[in-house]
Amino acid sequence: MQYRRILLKLSGEALAGKDGYGINAEMLERFAEEVKEARDMGAEIALVIGGGNIFRGVSDAAKNMDRVQADYMGMLATVINSIAFQDALERLGVYTRLQTAIKMEQMAEPFIRRRAIRHLEKGRVVIFGAGTGNPYFTTDTAASLRAIEIEADVIVKGTRVDGVYDSDPETNPSAEFFPKISYLDVIRKNLRVMDMTAITLCRENTLPIVVMNMNEKGNLSRLIRGEHVGSLVHA
């Protein structure tokens, strides 16, 4: 097994599917099955899910709002997605714990690092909601932070494309693909792998990032088995 402990970062838009907003039940179930398959192989899986399918603090909808208030709304959106994903996993028989950076005791545990690690060691999937609990930080940064805190072997960013390109392959068919690329090159080329705070955190803690297509069935399991999937961002 190439990676035993993984933090999977999914965008909220991924859960929306072709609808572009809200939660698509088919996409939710598909991603939950991918996570279950990886967990059943013996991997320890944690997740961070964005909230852009419901609300994004830097979106047009929030342009006249106070940024802090808008970001808190975005954090709540991530919790909605996290609860939905927890439910999807538990319907598949996967024990799942939701931990949030903001206390919501009726529906989630508070984030406690040692408890999260213990859950993972017991074979439970752990979902981290509400970002970092602080405004001005993205869920990419939250994913990097949590991955470092739980001592993950890798952070996997699930996207709609096959990995890292020099431009958007959905609009530029001749975009150059990078099977491997360094953190510094990502920063120098200003590639939209993750935001710069997240990339810098990973670089400073030598946490590798794999960017891959989560719409490709079985990709997560192939990665765990040691097959080359997507793009590797490394030192």
Curated annotation (Swiss-Prot):
The keyword DNA damage does not apply. PANTHER family: URIDYLATE KINASE, URIDYLATE KINASE PUMPKIN, CHLOROPLASTIC. It comes from Chlorobium luteolum (strain DSM 273 / BCRC 81028 / 2530). InterPro entries: AceGlu_kinase-like_sf (IPR036393), Asp/Glu/Uridylate_kinase (IPR001048), Uridylate_kinase (IPR011817), Uridylate_kinase_bac (IPR015963). Pfam families: AA_kinase (PF00696). This is Uridylate kinase. Belongs to the UMP kinase family. Pathway: Pyrimidine metabolism; CTP biosynthesis via de novo pathway; UDP from UMP (UMPK route): step 1/1. It catalyses: UMP + ATP = UDP + ADP. GO terms for cellular component: cytoplasm. Its main location: cytoplasm. The gene is pyrH. Residues 17-22 are annotated as: Involved in allosteric activation by GTP.
